[in-house]
Amino acid sequence: MRRVKYIILGAGSSGLTALGRIRRETDDFVMINGGAFGTTCARVGCMPSKALIHCAEHFHARKHFYDFGIDGADGLTINHTAVMKRVRAFRDRFTSGVQAGSTDTLGPDQLIKGFAKFVAPDIVEVNGEKIQGERIIIATGSRPVVPDAWKSLGDKLITSDEVFELEALPKRIAVIGLGIIGLEIGQALSRLGVEVIGFEMSNTLCGLQSPKASRQAIKLISREFPIYLGEAATVEETREGVKITVSSGTFEVDAVFASLGRRPNLDGIGLEALGVDLDNKGMPPFNIHTMQVSDLPVFIAGDVNGFRPILHEAGHEGKIAVNNAMAYPNMTAYKRKTPLGIAFVDPQIGFFGVGYESLDLDQTVVINFKLERNNGRAIVMGEDKGVISLYADKASKQLIGGELIMPHAEHFTHLLTWAVEQQLEVLELLRMPYYHPVLEEAVESAIGLLAEALYTRDEIEALETLSQN
């Protein structure tokens, strides 16, 4: 039986991060990958979706040309085939780039293509071969959730795994599940001329928790395509397409885009052989600060553990896992990053830090700043719609979280997340310089509202003096 120091299961973001670190120390490893290469982000997630969104944004802009004195927009048309070809070209560029610097450089003794299964806590079997590893990192990723009853729809059922392969877009599509992926794809398809209807089981979009931000998101996004919230949808194939039924009525579409979340790729890898208790979803016990499974020399990182299934977290978990795998049995508990999420819709949606539903409202200041008619730059852009919801701890006076729906929220969400990560007080944020006229002034106004609730007028007015010191 072959023996190696490290076994990495999965060649996604976490697995490749671990691979890079291990290769700097030793060649005594094997990477085993049973699915497609190139990472979820590059192949079916972040990157191709942004390519699609940018095409949609450019075409949608024609609707506002007249307001800016530009005539002739009515004559513009969209070539769906060319759009999807462009999306795939970028997708292929990114996936090729990922592989060129990682798996393409591995020899056949270091990279095995196949699905591995644990047969003992330190042994996996792949393609009929058993391999023993001193330390094992599980990074097998995730896949779209598809209800069994829907699978009979065949090619009328589309997930993020298939949408970017479409040569032509359907005329009518139901987007079921309006989290980040569903909302991004739904709005993009709508702007490209597809008739879109959105359905979501919860009463919010993108998992927003702030009541004000949630209402604003629903109001603004539903102007582009109809949205039905708080309703379970049933699907039924018809001769012409698919029938969608909710309590509000029945709708006929040509296809369904299922965006019901992602399921960790745990099944089939033999985790029961680890000798630890698995939960009702088949997940082994693991520490989010070490990525260690129980007390074993086994680590689980990235989408497969279901903790924070997003690229930057997968990379971070890959680093934690490999550092502790290399140091085993001496474990280091790493501080996790401040939660951060962004939806690339229009207006963009961002959320960070502590969620509204987790707040102790008696110990927290909550403010809501409406962008409408309150920011000069947004007004001249014709985009003064949105809200900034921020939360600050009364005792420490630190910013602890928030949600935004506004133009270019991706940038301001980062800015505010960094402030939470640095444990900055609200007054320190208000002391920062703000140029004019910029959208950042909206953030300044929102922070100012927090300051008014946390500090005396004298403390706020003393800012200039404090800055000079």
Language-model regions, residue ranges each:
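Short hydrophobic core segments
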Residues: 7-9, 116, 131-141, 175-176, ...
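FAD-site-proximal beta/loop scaffold in flavoenzymes
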Residues: 154-169, 251, 255-328, 415
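Glycine-rich flavin
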Residues: 2-4, 11, 20-27, 32-169, ...
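Flexible, glycine-rich terminal cap/loop adjacent to redox cofactors
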Residues: 2, 7-35, 40, 47, ...
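FAD-binding beta-loop-beta segment adjacent to the flavin cofactor pocket
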Residues: 144, 282-297, 377-389
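Rossmann-like NAD(P)H-binding beta-loop-alpha module
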Residues: 167-209, 310
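A conserved FAD-binding loop/helix module that cradles the flavin
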Residues: 209, 213-216, 301-357, 436-459, ...
